[in-house]
Swiss-Prot record:
Gene: XTH21
Described purpose of this protein according to its UniProt entry: Catalyzes xyloglucan endohydrolysis (XEH) and/or endotransglycosylation (XET). Cleaves and religates xyloglucan polymers, an essential constituent of the primary cell wall, and thereby participates in cell wall construction of growing tissues.
Lineage, top ranks: Eukaryota, Viridiplantae, Streptophyta, Embryophyta, Tracheophyta
Biological process according to GO: cell wall biogenesis; cell wall modification; primary root development; xyloglucan metabolic process
Record EC number: 2.4.1.207
Name the UniProt record assigns to this protein: Probable xyloglucan endotransglucosylase/hydrolase protein 21
Length: 305
């Protein structure tokens, strides 16, 4: 009973503190290129706000000017309000080429009153199929919320308002590919995916509710390692703790050398997954009838991460 009480107190304290998280953002004009949408994406308010639009003709999207090899990136997002069924808003990291790496946040719209689903995935060398989905436990359309990706040599962690919701560990020792050699850009987009996004495609986009708008602010890449090209030559080594390619050596050391989550973070992770997870590829034996992926059966339990 005492241990249960302490667990509740610990989680409550962690959740309360995470609300105080402050993200210092950059100027979108300096850090972001709007890459598609024919004017449906706009940078406003002296570079502090970016809106993406979607109508029946097209969605819109952007990418970071810089590429990163490892980092912690944050974005505050306010999702499409009202009947957003069929729409997908994204925030993700992705490399180039046919054997790309990718770390995804995708927010699946729904009919008014139903909760949003956040869809996460990790691609390595062009292969994904590592989906985990969660209901959001708040209204993501009423205010901006902070979404973060931590990617270092040991693990990848997805955060919402400072709370870890998923961890993908480096299990190369077991033959599981891990993103480590390909620099990634940060991307965001708003697009129509009514063939699959809402109830497996059963609910279609109601275009009379459009145009749809998702808003982004406070992009923070201060703790990301910029992949640099000097005199036409690509720097092939990632930054390490204290490297000048990151703007803050002390904070770089903290996230770069992190080998796993501490006990309090693990408790919050378990709480989120127990309460809000709606799909986990590591539990889908029907889909993987010939055996679950290696990381799902590893002793260090990537199954719940």
């Amino acid at each position: 009973m005492v241990s249960s009480t302490l667990l509740v107190m610990s989680i409550s304290l962690f959740l309360g503190l995470s609300i105080l998280l402050v993200v210092h953002g950059k100027d979108f004009n300096q850090d972001i290129d709007i890459t598609w949408g024919d004017g449906r994406g706009n940078i406003l308010n002296n570079g502090t706000l970016l809106n993406l639009g979607l109508d029946q003709s097209s969605g819109s999207g952007f990418q970071s000017k810089a590429e990163y090899l490892y980092g912690k990136v944050d974005m505050q997002i306010k999702l499409v309000p009202g009947n957003s069924a069929g729409t997908v808003t994204t925030f993700y990291l992705k490399s180039q080429g046919l054997t790309w790496d990718e770390i995804d946040f995708e927010f699946l719209g729904n009919v008014s009153g139903d909760p949003y689903i956040v869809h996460t995935n990790v691609y390595t060398q062009g292969k994904g199929d590592r989906e985990q989905q969660f209901y959001l436990w708040f209204d993501p359309t009423a205010a901006f919320h902070n979404y973060s990706i931590l990617w270092n040599p040991s693990h990848i962690v997805f955060y919402i308002d400072g709370k870890p919701i998923r961890e993908f560990k480096n299990l190369e020792v077991l033959g599981v590919a891990y993103p480590k050699n390909q620099p990634m850009r940060m991307y965001g987009s708003l697009w129509n995916a009514d063939d699959w996004a809402t109830r497996g495609g059963l609910v279609k986009t109601n275009w009379s509710q459009g145009p749809f708008v998702a808003s982004f602010m406070n992009y923070n890449s201060e703790n990301a390692c910029v992949w640099s090209i000097v005199n036409g030559t690509t720097t092939t080594s990632p930054c390490s703790p204290g490297d000048s390619t990151s703007s803050s050596s002390s904070s770089t050391s903290e996230w770069f050398s992190q080998r796993g989550m501490d006990s309090s973070s693990k408790k919050v992770l378990r709480w989120v997954q127990r309460k809000f997870m709606v799909y986990n590829y590591c539990k889908d034996k029907k889909r993987f009838s010939n055996g679950l992926p290696v990381e799902c059966t590893a002793k260090n339990k990537n199954t719940k991460s």
